[in-house]
UniProtKB/Swiss-Prot annotation:
It catalyses: a beta-lactam + H2O = a substituted beta-amino acid. This is Putative beta-lactamase HcpE. Disulfide bonds join C54-C62, C90-C98, C126-C134, C160-C168, C197-C205, C234-C242, C270-C278, C306-C314, C338-C346. The keyword Methyltransferase does not apply. GO terms for cellular component: extracellular region. Its EC number is 3.5.2.6. GO terms for biological process: response to antibiotic. It is found in: Secreted.
Length: 355
């Protein structure tokens, strides 16, 4: 889950922000010794010294203990102990402790799920300028407690102000689509997408590419700018960016036609979960113009696309099964393509069923 992954990263890097070196001298406080033990992977020793620090009123030690117990580092996972230590740290105004506490209430770990308690903890951390907590408040008001769109926008904005790329991206999407009760504005969408893309949010770079490609950014169409943003999106492992580049090279749209480059981008996108790109690879293998003709690979890639919800992939896959005299699988896959909204799949399904 995203919150837990984020906390593991926080745990791994936490000591870096707490380094208490002075004039090159080693920090021999309980916290300092604990940090060095944690860094070296000696979690039992780290926990021992973090506990001493926590007992001495050093809130960072309490937070680090919470992280250790939550993630089961050198000990079994114990969410109740994690909750206890996060709560102690948060009461001492430690923002990471409040963030950890909010996460446990948010997820219902070690306690009953309680959005109000999560909100209280995240809100305190947000006031203490913790970007992820502001963002998580936005998520709660946006997706978990309905009817709070204005609050969601407020906290997404705070997270964006603290350079949380995902918060900026969501605001960009809200303004582009008119979500969260904001007035639709491509101009504002571009502003938020630009910041998110600068902060290496691939989805935002992809969105910018689309806006500039289609001339929807309040500016004239600018294919060079669109191409640059799509390249950045792809480099940031955004499947949509890679898929769009593949389409450009396949069709020779705004760039010199290059089927091999198209195939390479489709493969990248497919491996990142782009259903359409998997289906396009299937087509290229079935034709054999760019890569060696390989019907087995064509079938496999159509199947990947279909499994991920691409109706064209399902239609092509069903056709291959039909040509292989496998009527049962052809019917099953045409049925799936039909349910995904492909009219021709519905027509073929009716013919095969004989009614």
């Amino acid at each position: 889950m995203n919150i837990k992954i984020l906390k593991i990263l926080v745990g791994g890097l936490f000591f870096l922000s707490l380094n208490a070196h002075l004039w090159g001298k080693q920090d021999n406080s309980f916290l300092g010794i604990g940090e060095r033990a944690y860094k070296s992977g000696n979690y039992s020793k780290a926990a021992s010294y973090f506990k001493k620090a926590c007992n001495d009123g050093v809130s960072e030690g309490c937070t680090q203990l919470g992280i250790i117990y939550e993630n089961g580092q050198g000990t079994r996972i114990d969410y109740k102990k994690a909750l206890e230590y996060y709560k102690t740290a948060c009461q001492a105004d430690d923002r990471e402790g409040c963030f950890g506490l909010g996460g446990l209430y948010d997820e219902g770990l070690g306690t009953a799920q309680n959005y109000q308690e999560a909100i209280d903890a995240y809100a305190k951390a947000c006031v203490l300028k913790h970007p992820e907590s502001c963002y998580n408040l936005g998520i709660i008001y946006d997706r978990k407690i309905k009817g709070n769109a204005a609050q969601a926008v407020t906290y997404y904005q705070k997270s964006c102000n603290f350079d949380m790329a995902k918060g900026c991206y969501i605001l960009g999407t809200a303004y582009e689509k008119g979500f969260l009760e904001v007035k639709q504005s491509n101009h504002k969408a571009v502003i938020y997408y630009l910041k998110a893309c600068r902060l290496n949010e691939g989805q935002a770079c992809r969105a910018l590419g689309s806006l500039f490609e289609n001339g929807d950014a309040g500016l004239d169409e600018d294919f060079e700018v669109a191409f640059d943003y799509l390249q950045k999106a792809c480099a940031l492992n955004n499947s949509g960016g890679c898929a769009s580049l593949g389409s450009m090279y396949m069709l020779g749209r705004y760039v010199k036609k290059d089927p091999q480059k198209a195939f390479n981008y489709f493969k990248q996108a497919c491996d990142m979960g782009s259903a359409v790109s998997c289906s396009r690879m299937g087509f290229m293998y079935s034709q054999g113009d760019t890569v060696s003709k390989d019907l087995r690979k064509a079938l496999d890639n159509y199947e990947r696309g279909c499994d991920m919800g691409d109706e064209v992939g399902c239609f092509a896959l069903a056709g291959m099964y039909y040509n292989m005299k496998d009527k049962e699988n052809a019917i099953m896959i045409y049925d799936k393509g039909c349910k995904l909204g492909m009219k021709q799949a519905c027509e073929n399904l009716t013919k095969l069923r004989g009614y």
